[in-house]
Amino acid sequence: MTTINCDMGEAFGLYRMGDDETLMPLISVANVACGFHASDFNHMRKTVRLAKQHHVKVGAHPSLPDLQGFGRREMKMSRDELANCIIYQVGALKGFLEAEDVALNHIKPHGSLYGMAARSDAVAHAICDAADVFKTPLMGMIGTQHEIVYRARGHAFIAEYYADLDYDDDGSLIITREHKAVDPAEVASRCLRAIAEGKTRSIHSRDVPVRADSICVHSDTPNAVEVARAVRDALTSRRQ
């Protein structure tokens, strides 16, 4: 059954990002920010509690150490540095999960770290080095180093499809610094096609292969609530 995942807990101190309270009942999996691109100790625990309240599974959403750039700027780090960076973040979230008696469901890298791992086997291996510590599945995209390296290293692989981002002609994701509003009905239609046909349209209207074990909706998309509701309703109708 295809799930809906959403990046959550991305507020920081007095700064707000996303409508987590409204989004949480609409999703099945929350990727919780771990402090390096967004969030802090108070928001992490608050988000874990909110997910528990709505019976939403929780995964870690670690980032490059780029709080000012929201984790959407690339950095050069050694494999050991990167693995330690991820272990540090996931370990922090795991402490809050244990405090609330909630299991760690998966790890999904954030932003530029996600994009780098899709292209670079060295970065993907660093992520696996961290995942080895926590013995948890990894979320990523088919046809990339995510799938190749994660599977080769023996990690369960959750293939995701992005509801609110564009794909390039080679099937890679176009990661932008800021997200724009999208048409909920069009997004829902794209998601259903991704599930049924394993295809989506690129920015130049070419079909590229995808797989949608889980569908991602970003909480910082301006109309994220409407998008999540449209995707949820489409999936519910498909199952009936």
Kindly label every feature range from the protein language model.
Residues 7, 61, 107, 217:
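Conserved, mostly hydrophobic/aromatic
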Residues 12-45:
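A short alpha/beta connector and helix-capping loop motif
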Residues 21-25, 46-59, 98-99:
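Acidic (Asp/Glu)-rich catalytic clusters
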Residues 32-37, 116-119, 134-143:
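Catalytic beta/alpha-barrel core
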Residues 51, 193, 224-240:
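C-terminal helical cap(s) of enzyme catalytic domains, especially alpha/beta-barrels
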Residues 66-101, 106:
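Glycine/small-residue-rich loop that forms an oxyanion/phosphate-binding "nest" at active or ligand-binding sites
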Residues 97-105, 198-209, 240:
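Flexible, glycine/charged-enriched surface loops at secondary-structure junctions
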Residues 143-199:
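Active-site rim beta-loop-alpha module in soluble metabolic enzymes
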